[in-house]
């Protein structure tokens, strides 16, 4: 009988069954779960896409997505990536299954895969089941946030008030402010921004963006978005175009003020996504730039110039920076402080930096030394090289082209505060080959004026007129120091540019290494004798002439030049010896200047062209104007490449040989001359007349028969300035309709017999007309002779700016009917007792705040004026000003 026993199987079977139900289903139901996962994921994606389209519509209205919804989107994106991987491995995993999918060739792998499919299916179903009634909210923005501000610049209150008033005008959508670096533009813009912070003025948002040199559209968009509360992960996923659309849709329903600081180039508002404030009612754009060009390109045709401070205001700012303790430490310091402050020329940046530097200097010696450093080489002054000059250098670096940069550096050769004639600058640039003159002088001049315009618009030069009314520019002292610093390779090679202009030196300065000197300016000094030889192998420009300082003109005093002085200057291209009145001759050794292209001997005592000058074969520009002792120019025909010859005011006797010799100069393009009425050989020379840019006919003795000139026929389209003085002449004949297309300035003085000036009808570009002491003149434009012009549709004086009439006892008529005079700024009437009617009506003359004014000498004349109508009288009578001084032409001797 054997032993019997029993084992209970039910618990084991239950455990296996539970495992198969829970774990085995991962593999057994894999195919079914995969189908369900794929279907449910497609439904989830459809729901997500529907919500994203809704989101875009709401964000385009300026709403901001909820963080909760963004978390849901992120979870959908994460699970989608996982499911893509799972579905990619589907076929491989199904093929592993066996025994009716209850088993697998690799049980562990199939189990893990099946479990992952099951869990993802549950997650997708959960995500799909979430409901979003709201997915966005209003973006949270701060209307204005006050910006930190440097202490208000003394003296800018008036400018700030003007800017605020202009910006707040209903018609102002865009306002630009321009000026040189360091003048206070950013301070002014910040003050405007903070004024909006205090008084919102009905605006929803104020936005401040610093743009700087490299315009980065996306960077600007990001800064605006951050201000508007539109940033975040979703913002960074957009490209520039999408960001622009988003910003535009947000801002188009807002009243905003956008402040852009430090623009160097035009910024396309449309590309950024900013609605145009000129068409978006109630919106404003205010910006700063160093460039007038940028302001106009941004849409502000009349931007506000931020100028340097006036002298007294500048000194107030300087005193604040220095401090009363330092100013009161020695009785002599305040006077020296004013000298130092003046060196800053009203530039707030320089006043602040130099004022802070001097705030601890409490001895006379320290202040005197500061003045010495600023006068000799200002870049060495503490704070200049690290705080002032680099800031200004940004403007230099932003200039387009090396020729423009070189042109600016050239201006630093002139004295401080000098009024530099544009014409002189351009002549030097051409002969130094900064400007290409191969296509002719006039085209090169046009390039030069374009360069000057770009430098003015970049706030690196300022336009003005000199003492003789010539168009000129001034270089701010601090800009000049910056240019000298750059020219010296940032202070490394200080002797590259030797500039001692107008400082009273009596001899050539001492230089350690003459071989590195490229340009030297000793204008307006007290050097009497140029002696010795200097090895200036790289010297290209040597300026030894005059200089104009504000309202003062300083002449040079050179009397003699030694024979060896020019021996070692093989590259010298520009030599200016003008205004050395006691210089009567040049050494024959001037012929050693084998590269010389420009020679200025105007206002010197030169009597003739030396043999040495005749051997200057490369010379293209020779200036002999106002050489009152010049007896002949024999030998000038040897200067085969001469293109510009200036003889105005030279009193050169014009004989037949002189005319013939000049006619042999085949490359001559420009001629300026003074002739006497007898010089008929010159007047009959078509070659010389056609090249004349300035022609003066001057009778030397009013009682001499030599001054008789029965009639004059001038036919040249190059003539720009025309003067007739001290002559008896009955008529200036009219030529063809294109005779005087370039004529801009006409002066007639002390001429008998002349009854009318109808030839002027053929001068459409005439800007200045001065007629003084013409006893027989009856008409400016004679009615009968003008008929020919009127038949051609000509309206006289379309560009006339200045009209000066004096000592004309018989003058009755300027023109028989009113003229537009669109450019007319000033009429001056002296002794003209019979001139009772002016050719004006209520629409004539320059309009606006600086409209046409009338100066008159005799109050009886004004009482007798017959105005065209009451409207004309109302328009011009308030602008009439009584002037007692004699109205007469000023001309150079």
Curated annotation (Swiss-Prot):
Gene Ontology CC, one term = nucleus
The record lists ATP as bound by 179-186
In terms of superkingdom, the source organism counts as Eukaryota
Q: Which GO terms describe its molecular function?
A: ADP binding; ATP binding
**Which function does this protein serve?**
Probable disease resistance protein.
Q: Family per UniProt?
A: Belongs to the disease resistance NB-LRR family.
Q: What is this protein called?
A: Probable disease resistance protein At1g62630
Q: Which organism is it from?
A: Arabidopsis thaliana (Mouse-ear cress)
Organism classification: Eukaryota, Viridiplantae, Streptophyta, Embryophyta, Tracheophyta
């Amino acid at each position: 009988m054997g032993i019997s026993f029993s084992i209970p199987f039910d618990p084991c079977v239950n455990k296996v069954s539970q495992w198969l139900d829970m774990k085995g289903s991962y593999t057994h139901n894999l195919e079914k779960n995969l189908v369900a996962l794929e279907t449910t994921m497609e439904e989830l994606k459809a729901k997500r896409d529907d919500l994203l389209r809704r989101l875009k519509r709401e964000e385009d209205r300026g709403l901001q997505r909820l963080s909760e919804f963004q978390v849901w989107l992120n979870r959908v994106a994460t699970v989608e990536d996982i499911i893509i991987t799972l579905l990619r491995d589907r076929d491989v995993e199904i093929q592993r299954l066996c025994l009716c999918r209850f088993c697998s060739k690799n049980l562990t792998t199939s189990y893990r895969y099946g479990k992952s499919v099951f869990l993802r299916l549950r997650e997708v179903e959960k995500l799909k089941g979430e409901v979003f009634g709201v997915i966005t909210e209003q973006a949270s923005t701060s209307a204005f946030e006050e910006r930190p501000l440097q202490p208000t610049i003394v003296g800018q209150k008036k400018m700030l008030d003007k800017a605020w008033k202009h910006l707040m005008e209903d018609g102002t959508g865009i306002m630009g402010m321009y000026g040189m670096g360091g003048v206070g533009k950013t301070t002014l813009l910040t003050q405007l921004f903070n004024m909006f912070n205090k008084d919102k003025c009905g605006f929803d948002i104020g936005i401040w963006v610093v743009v700087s040199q490299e315009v980065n559209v996306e960077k600007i968009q990001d800064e605006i978005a951050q201000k508007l509360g539109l940033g975040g992960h979703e913002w960074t996923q957009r490209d520039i175009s999408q960001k622009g659309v988003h910003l535009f849709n947000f801002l188009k329903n807002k009243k905003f003020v956008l402040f852009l600081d430090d623009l160097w180039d035009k910024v396309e508002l449309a590309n950024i996504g900013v609605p145009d404030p000129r068409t978006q009612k109630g919106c404003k754009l205010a910006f700063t730039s160093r460039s007038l060009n940028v302001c106009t390109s941004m849409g502000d045709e009349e931007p506000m110039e931020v100028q340097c401070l006036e002298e007294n205001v500048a000194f107030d700012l300087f005193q604040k920076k220095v401090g009363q303790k330092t100013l009161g430490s020695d009785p002599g310091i305040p006077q020296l402080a004013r000298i130092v402050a003046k060196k800053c020329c009203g530039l707030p940046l320089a006043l602040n930096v130099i004022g802070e530097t001097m705030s601890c200097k409490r001895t006379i010696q320290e202040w005197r030394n500061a003045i010495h450093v600023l006068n000799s080489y200002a870049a060495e002054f503490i704070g200049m090289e690290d705080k002032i000059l680099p800031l200004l250098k940004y403007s230099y670096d932003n200039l387009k082209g090396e020729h423009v940069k070189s042109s600016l550096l050239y201006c630093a050769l002139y004295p401080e505060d000098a009024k530099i004639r544009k014409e002189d600058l351009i002549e030097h640039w051409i002969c130094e080959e900064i400007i290409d003159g191969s296509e002719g002088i006039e085209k090169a001049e046009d390039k030069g004026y374009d360069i000057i315009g770009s430098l003015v618009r970049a706030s690196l030069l300022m336009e003005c007129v000199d003492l003789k009314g010539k168009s000129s520019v001034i270089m701010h002292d601090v800009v000049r120091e910056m240019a000298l610093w750059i020219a010296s390779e940032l202070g490394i090679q200080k002797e590259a540019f030797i500039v001692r202009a107008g400082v009273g030196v009596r001899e050539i300065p001492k230089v350690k290494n003459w071989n590195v000197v490229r340009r030297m300016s000793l204008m307006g000094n007290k050097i009497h004798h140029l002696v010795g030889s200097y090895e200036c192998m790289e010297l290209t420009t040597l300026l030894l002439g005059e200089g104009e300082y504000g309202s003062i003109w300083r002449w040079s005093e050179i009397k003699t030049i030694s024979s060896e002085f020019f021996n070692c200057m093989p590259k010298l291209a520009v030599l200016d010896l003008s205004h050395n009145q006691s210089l009567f001759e040049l050494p024959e050794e001037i012929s050693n200047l084998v590269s010389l292209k420009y020679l200025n001997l105007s206002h010197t005592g030169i009597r003739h062209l030396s043999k040495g000058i005749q051997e200057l074969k490369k010379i293209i520009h020779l200036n002999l104007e106002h050489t009152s002792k010049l007896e002949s120019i024999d030998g000038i025909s040897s200067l085969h490449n001469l293109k510009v010859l200036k003889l105005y005011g030279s009193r050169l006797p014009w004989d037949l040989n002189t005319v013939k010799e000049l006619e042999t100069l085949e490359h001559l393009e420009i001629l300026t001359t003074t002739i006497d009425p007898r010089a008929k050989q010159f007047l009959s020379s078509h070659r010389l007349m056609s090249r004349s840019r300035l022609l003066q006919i001057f009778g030397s003795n009013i009682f001499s028969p030599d001054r008789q000139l029965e009639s004059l026929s001038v036919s040249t389209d190059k003539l720009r300035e025309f003067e007739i003085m001290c002559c008896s002449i009955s008529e200036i004949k009219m030529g063809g309709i294109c005779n005087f297309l370039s004529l801009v300035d006409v002066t007639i003085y002390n001429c008998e017999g002349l009854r009318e000036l109808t030839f002027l009808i053929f001068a459409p570009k005439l800007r200045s007309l001065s007629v003084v002491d013409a006893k027989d003149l009856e008409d400016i434009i004679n009615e009968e002779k003008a008929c020919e012009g009127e038949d051609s549709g000509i309206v006289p004086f379309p560009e006339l700016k200045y009209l000066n009439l004096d000592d004309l006892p018989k003058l009755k008529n300027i023109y028989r009917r009113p003229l537009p005079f669109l450019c007319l700024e000033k009429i001056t009437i002296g002794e003209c007792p019979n001139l009772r009617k002016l050719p004006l009506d209520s629409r004539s003359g320059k309009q606006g705040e600086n409209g046409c004014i009338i100066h008159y000498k005799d109050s009886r004349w004004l009482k007798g004026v017959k105005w065209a109508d009451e409207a004309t009288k109302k328009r011009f009578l308030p602008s009439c000003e009584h002037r007692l001084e004699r109205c007469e032409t000023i001309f150079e001797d």
